[in-house]
Amino acid sequence: GNEFATIICSPNHLEELVLGFLASEGVISKIDELESIQIDDSKGGARVELTHQLGNFFDYSTKRMIASCCGKNREFYFQNDAVIAKTSMTHIELLQNQVLNMMTQLQGASNIFKQTGGLHNAAISDCNDFFEHRQDIGRHNALDKLYGYCIQTVSYTHLRAHETREDL
């Protein structure tokens, strides 16, 4: 197999991180596309076997693409991002107090942040309560862990994910 990525991360929920990362990169779109996944905590690595070939995926995943960004165009750094990105047509309205309340709840649940002074948190919420919460030293990792959790366990079309960065 080929090495796909090196990720510097917090050492928890690693299978979720791998699943979420592969999905966010467009390698998989559902858990059924995995033949197997093995996490080796002692070596800090993961081995994944897919049910399908990647074909020319690596040609697009590393090719830079810079769009003009005029009007509704969007800038993508890699060509593969343009292939997998989808525009959300969901209309969401949040009240200011909902956002502040969720942020306070999320910060209160972050024991590691309280101990270390810096960490990224992400949560799945219905705009009132949190259903699931992940932490990581990398903000994208925290989101990928939640994405992996969703792929493994829930139908998340009715849920919203959001992130807060906590600093001193």
Regions found by a protein language model. Give the residues of each.
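General alpha-helical segment detector with a strong preference for membrane-spanning helices
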Residues: 24, 166-167
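Intrinsically disordered, low-complexity regions enriched in acidic/Ser/Thr/Pro/Gln residues
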Residues: 2-125, 132-133
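Small-side-chain structural scaffolding
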Residues: 18, 46, 122, 142, ...
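Glycine- and Gly-Pro-enriched alpha-helical subdomains that act as flexible
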Residues: 115-118, 123-156
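Conserved small/polar residues in nucleotide/adenosyl-binding loops
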Residues: 157-166
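Alpha-helix N-cap/helix-start and coil->helix boundary motif
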Residues: 14, 139-140, 166
